[in-house]
Every structure is written in structure tokens, then in C-alpha cells.
Curated annotation (Swiss-Prot):
Transmembrane residue ranges: none
Family to which this protein belongs: Belongs to the UPF0178 family.
Name of the protein described by the UniProt record: UPF0178 protein CKO_02784
Lineage of producing organism: Bacteria, Pseudomonadati, Pseudomonadota, Gammaproteobacteria, Enterobacterales
A matching Pfam family: DUF188
HAMAP family membership: UPF0178 (MF_00489)
């Protein structure tokens, strides 16, 4: 099992949580980005640099992830694709994407895209709060416990 990170858009504070968790869990953590990233020295943490371009990092994550892996992303279409492969998906705010919620999320995303395309200012998400960080760490631990139960 591997934790994959859509790293270009992942907040640094979330990456820090993931670095510590990867060491604690002794789980491979792969950060996929179209730029060089600095990561702490570790036998569990590595980066995968992809060429710049629309959805290049997303496509690489989809290509390489497997059932049972975890993907960290705020990209709803990417989350949908990895769920289809049997991987879990978690956004940086700690919201777990599921088969039952992803359709609604995709519909809302498409609706917001339509509003923006028509010139309506929709605003962006609030900045990551301490509560969001705690929620992310808790959901990451919850996923890890599920993995441990399945592999016993």
C-alpha cells in the first residue's frame, strides 16, 4: 500500500502531517508534482516529478495507484477515478470521498464551473484552519486503522 499525494496543490502543513505519518506507519509516501519538491530524508518518502501540463500529475496517480492505496487530493475528478480503481481518497480538509458522495461532488463542481464560465464570481475555499488540519490527521489515522484491520 502507498499514499499518493497530488502535491502541486497540497498545502505544506498537510504535507508535514503526511511526512510524519509515513514514518510512523512505515508506509510509502509518493508526492507527484510538476516541479521539484523538497522532502525530508526518509526511506519511505519520495517525489515523482512529471512534465507540466493539464492533468499530467493526476493521470500519473491514476495510472500507478492500486486498490487499497490512499490518494490525497482536492481534485474531485481525480478522486472519482481513483475510487473506481479501489483506492481511498481524502482531501486536505479531511473529507473522505466515497462512492456515495463523489457523484454529488462532481455535479456541484460542474455547476460551479458553469457559473464561473458565465462570469459569476464564486470565490474560493476558505484557508485551511487548525480544525481542518486536525480533521485531516484524524481521518488519516482512521484510514490507517482500517488498513491494519484488513491486513491482520
Amino acid at each position: 500500500m502507498t499514499i499518493w499525494v497530488d502535491a502541486d496543490a497540497c498545502p505544506n502543513v498537510i504535507k508535514e502531517i503526511l511526512y510524519r505519518a509515513s514514518e510512523r506507519m512505515q508506509m510509502p509516501l509518493i508526492l507527484v508534482a510538476n516541479q521539484n519538491l523538497r522532502v525530508p530524508p526518509s526511506r519511505f518518502i519520495r517525489t515523482l516529478r512529471v512534465p507540466a501540463g493539464f492533468d499530467v500529475a493526476d493521470n500519473e496517480i491514476v495510472r500507478q495507484c492500486e486498490a487499497g492505496d490512499l490518494v490525497i487530493t482536492a481534485d474531485i475528478p481525480l478522486a472519482s477515478e481513483v475510487l473506481e480503481k479501489g483506492a481511498a481518497a481524502l482531501n486536505p480538509r479531511g473529507e473522505r470521498y466515497t462512492e456515495s458522495t463523489i457523484r454529488e461532488r462532481l455535479t456541484m463542481r460542474d455547476f460551479m464551473d458553469t457559473l464561473r464560465a458565465s462570469g459569476i464570481q464564486t470565490g474560493g475555499p476558505d484557508s485551511l484552519s487548525p480544525r481542518d488540519r486536525q480533521h485531516f490527521a484524524a481521518e488519516l489515522d482512521k484510514w490507517w486503522l482500517e488498513v491494519q484491520r484488513r491486513t491482520r
